[in-house]
Regions:
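Structured interaction patches on ligand/partner-binding surfaces of diverse proteins
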Residues: 135-163
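Short, acidic Ser/Thr/Gly-rich low-complexity loop/linker segments typical of extracellular
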Residues: 103-119
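Short, ordered, surface-exposed loop/turn motifs in non-cytosolic proteins
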Residues: 89-104
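Extracellular "spike/adhesin" assembly and maturation modules
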Residues: 1-69
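A short, solvent-exposed beta-strand micro-motif common in secreted/extracellular proteins
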Residues: 125-136, 230-234
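Low-complexity, glycine/proline-biased repetitive segments and flexible coils/loops
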Residues: 187-413
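Short, surface-exposed beta-strand/beta-hairpin micro-motifs centered on an aromatic residue
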Residues: 116-123, 217
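A short, amphipathic beta-strand motif
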Residues: 80-88
Length: 413
């Protein structure tokens, strides 16, 4: 409820009643900046509320007496009830807010307010602290509120939150959130984790064929999940392959996804690790496909650039025959916007093939085939790592690691 806030306290306007001496109509003329909550049956005690307690023609005091008797009869000694209500700055109920209840420094319970913004919590008598953590969809005014619970009594606490009607958030770690009722639509953009490049050390005669990794797939999708809890999983980037002998495929990245509690799903698939193919016949080796394709490699000094913006990988030098990793065929830009930030470049194939946008460049084995081959890691979300190859046994071949995925949401757009 709100107090009346007058600009001119106590001012009234008196108007003579026509034909009636010394009789006046009187009205307020205080020009309130806040009209306040009127005092009537609707705001004090509705008949429907009284009926819940088996009362008719009741006053508010009748209900309070009944509540006290109920608490004494039904609450064990040493236990009280905390009544938490979450409201906006105008006093309107805001439901679906998670409130943590602390005793000392420990969280003893997390509760969620109902649609009417209220929740009843039974607790042992004592001192508590209530906290609403930072929220995606709300600005939190009541960050930390003390509350004392008394034996067989009620403690009423209002906590203030302000809805953010239009917003955009990026998630780079797995998490969960609840979509409030006022958010009718979400636009989701997801990027899968990029794979890592393949690596080879000590294998001569151009065998095996070593390729860069593909970038993670991307997806933009609109969903409607008001009131649902959504769980986000961010796909990891594939870890680098770091060896001094033999040859190994790169590691796949991880899927990035959003799943609502009713099963609505947005999934961006992982980028694949680069391929290490025992290829003594000097044939081409295909790079892996993904959001953007990974570069292939087959011959000494041949190069294959990783793909960008959902495209296939491309040959940039050398003399061999190639089949490249294919891209998804649609843009990998942020929310699919023409000028949006670019993600999910493919990794380069050896010898020094460049990566796609943010994809790792391939490692160079150097003059006389005697150098370590150290590849650059991917540097943008969802990008694949480059391949690494050295011909000398005992030399280090380290492929490029893939970069983790990303998920972003927009609402109120």
């Amino acid at each position: 409820m709100f107090d009346r806030v007058p600009l001119y306290p106590g001012r009234v306007k008196m108007t003579p009643v026509s034909g009636q001496a010394n009789i006046y109509d009187m009205e307020r003329a205080d020009k309130p900046t806040q009209a306040g909550t009127p005092l009537n049956k609707t705001t004090l005690l509705k008949d429907s509320t009284a009926a819940l307690y088996g009362l008719t023609d009741a006053t508010p005091d009748d209900v309070f007496v009944l509540l006290k008797r109920y608490s004494e009869a039904n609450m064990p000694a040493g236990t009280g009830t905390l009544v938490i209500t979450t409201v906006d700055s105008s006093g309107n109920a805001v439901g679906g807010i998670d409130v943590k209840i602390f005793r000392g420094s420990s969280v003893i319970k997390t509760v969620r307010t109902e649609e009417d913004g209220c929740i009843f919590v039974s607790l042992s008598a004592g001192n508590y602290t209530l906290s609403i953590e930072e929220s995606v969809f709300y600005e939190i005014s009541s960050v930390s509120v003390p509350a004392e619970v008394v034996s067989r009594g009620f403690r009423f606490i209002n906590m203030v939150v302000s809805p953010i009607l239009t917003g955009e958030v990026r998630f780079t770690q797995s998490t969960a959130f609840t979509v409030p009722a006022f958010v009718k639509k979400l636009k989701v953009f997801a990027v899968g984790g990029g794979g890592s490049g393949a690596a080879s050390s000590g294998r001569n005669n151009n065998a095996p064929c070593i390729t860069g990794a593909s970038g993670g797939y991307t997806i933009t999708k609109e969903i409607s999940v008001p009131g649902e809890k959504c769980t986000i999983t961010i796909g990891a980037g594939g870890p680098a392959i770091d060896i001094t002998s033999s040859y190994y495929n790169g590691k796949d990245g991880g899927d990035t996804k959003l799943v609502s509690e009713k099963g609505v799903t947005v999934l961006a698939g992982r980028g694949l690790g680069g391929f290490a193919i025992d290829n003594s016949a000097y044939q081409y080796g295909a790079g892996p496909s993904g959001g953007s394709g990974g570069g292939s490699g087959a011959y000494e000094n041949d190069e294959a650039a990783g793909g960008s913006d959902g495209g296939d990988a491309a040959k940039t030098g050398g003399t061999g025959s190639y089949r490249y990793g294919y891209g998804q065929g649609t843009t990998t830009r942020y929310f699919g916007d023409t000028n949006g930030e670019l993600f999910s470049g493919g990794g380069g194939g050896y010898a020094n093939g460049p990566g796609g946008n943010g994809g790792g460049t391939a490692g160079v084995y150097g003059s006389e085939y005697s150098s370590d081959a150290i590849c650059l890691d991917a540097t943008t979300y969802g990008a694949g790592g480059g391949a690494a190859k050295t011909y000398t046994a005992g030399k280090r071949a380290k492929s490029g690691a893939g970069y983790q995925g990303l998920l972003a949401i927009k609402w109120g757009y």
